[in-house]
């Protein structure tokens, strides 16, 4: 029989049921405190536009502020404007509902055990996200030009083989459309270049319209008025106008395989030679800081003094297959490139779109080098989709 002392010890050694062990209480997330709109606008204006799609998921009020004119006015006053990339994909010819995407930062889902996973070399953490399709939809095969935060679209096909003279402006701050005065002629896939506050629109006509007095239409952005520029000694059998660019004070225009150059200061047209048109005509192209670039089987830039194309060496870019679709764009003084990876199997229903940003360096007047800052897969789409537009705006 146990002694009373042992019993007491047993009793005293038992835990008091009324005294419970404190449990670790995980902190309950608190709602975002209500801040004045003007303070939120000031905060958002200092954040990169790449994060806006993520911030817009927080609440309706955030979404409203992120699309407000006041936010972008504040960004401009603070000197926080930046380039923003857009990509348009189409399916079919014409496609009544093309898909529009913009580049943004991925939500950070790389946390594991409280630590970030190491990102792969050359990765940026970016991806393409869809933006609402504007209503009414944009015409297929329209020409385009970016001016500040706006993208101007000229002409295109309303339906198969029916050209349009419609001009539409996409406001990339709010992703809304507004109409502008129509072209004086119906055009499909015209070339457009921005020069000193005006947009020069050329091409997109053929047949009986090819020798019209309106081969080039000029739109004054400030007054919203159209004018035109005739091309002297243009012969109809030269071919169609298909490319344009403004470089070194001259407006270059391809007519078939010929290239004409218009000197704005002297108001004079000259032949620019055949060499310029050979690579330019069959490739995607863009102008970056007064230099014309193109990509066909290699990256090239045009030397206006020697009037010839030179190959640009690019360091760090994966080798592109010959059958890939490629688009290049001016991305704040750098080159952005989109390309699609060919499907390894004919049975594949999707393909991957990749993006790279290339920093450009000109060590002397005879060379330009490219160095890839990052490249990665940014979107997966059905194989039936093709590139239509790739460009950047300033927001």
Curated annotation (Swiss-Prot):
Signal peptide: none annotated. SUPFAM superfamilies: F-box domain, Kelch motif. It comes from the Eukaryota. Residues 1-25 have a biased composition (Basic residues). Keywords: Kelch repeat, Repeat. Kelch repeats lie at residues 150-197, 198-246. Residues 1-29 are annotated as: Disordered. Residues 29-75 form the F-box domain. This is F-box/kelch-repeat protein At4g39570. It comes from Arabidopsis thaliana (Mouse-ear cress).
């Amino acid at each position: 029989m146990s002694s009373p002392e042992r019993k007491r010890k047993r009793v005293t050694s038992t835990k008091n049921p009324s005294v419970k062990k404190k449990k670790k209480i995980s902190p309950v997330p608190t709602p975002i405190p209500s801040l004045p709109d003007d303070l939120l606008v000031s905060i958002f204006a200092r954040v990169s536009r790449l994060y806006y799609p993520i911030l817009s998921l927080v609440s309706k009020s955030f979404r409203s502020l992120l699309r407000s004119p006041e936010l972008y006015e504040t960004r401009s006053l603070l000197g926080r404007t930046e380039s923003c990339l857009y990509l348009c994909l189409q399916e079919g010819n014409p496609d009544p509902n093309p898909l529009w995407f913009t580049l943004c930062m991925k939500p950070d889902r790389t946390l594991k055990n409280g630590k970030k996973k190491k990102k792969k070399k050359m990765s940026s953490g970016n991806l393409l996200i869809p933006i609402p399709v504007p209503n009414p939809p944009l015409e297929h095969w329209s020409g385009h030009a970016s001016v500040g935060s706006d993208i101007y679209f000229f002409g295109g096909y309303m339906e198969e083989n029916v050209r349009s003279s419609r001009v539409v402006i996409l406001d990339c701050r709010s992703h809304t459309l507004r109409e502008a005065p129509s072209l004086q002629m119906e055009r499909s896939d015209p070339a457009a270049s921005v020069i000193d506050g005006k947009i020069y629109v050329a091409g997109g006509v053929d047949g009986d319209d090819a020798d019209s007095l309106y081969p080039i239409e000029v739109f004054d952005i400030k007054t919203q008025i159209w004018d035109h520029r005739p091309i002297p000694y243009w012969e109809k059998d030269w071919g169609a106008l298909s490319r344009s660019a403004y470089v070194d004070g001259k407006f270059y225009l391809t007519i078939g395989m010929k290239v004409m150059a218009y000197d704005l200061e002297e108001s004079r047209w000259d032949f620019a030679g055949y060499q310029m048109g050979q690579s330019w005509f069959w490739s995607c192209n863009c102008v970056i800081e007064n230099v014309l670039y193109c990509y066909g089987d290699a990256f090239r830039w045009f030397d206006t003094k020697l009037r010839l194309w030179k190959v640009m060496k690019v360091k760090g870019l994966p080798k592109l297959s010959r059958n890939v679709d490629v688009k290049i764009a001016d991305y704040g003084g750098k080159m952005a490139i989109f390309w699609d990876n060919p499907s390894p199997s004919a049975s594949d229903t999707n393909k991957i779109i990749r993006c790279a940003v290339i920093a450009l360096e000109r060590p002397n007047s005879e060379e330009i080098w490219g160095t890839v800052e990052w490249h990665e897969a940014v979107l997966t789409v059905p194989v039936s989709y093709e590139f239509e537009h790739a460009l950047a705006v300033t927001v």
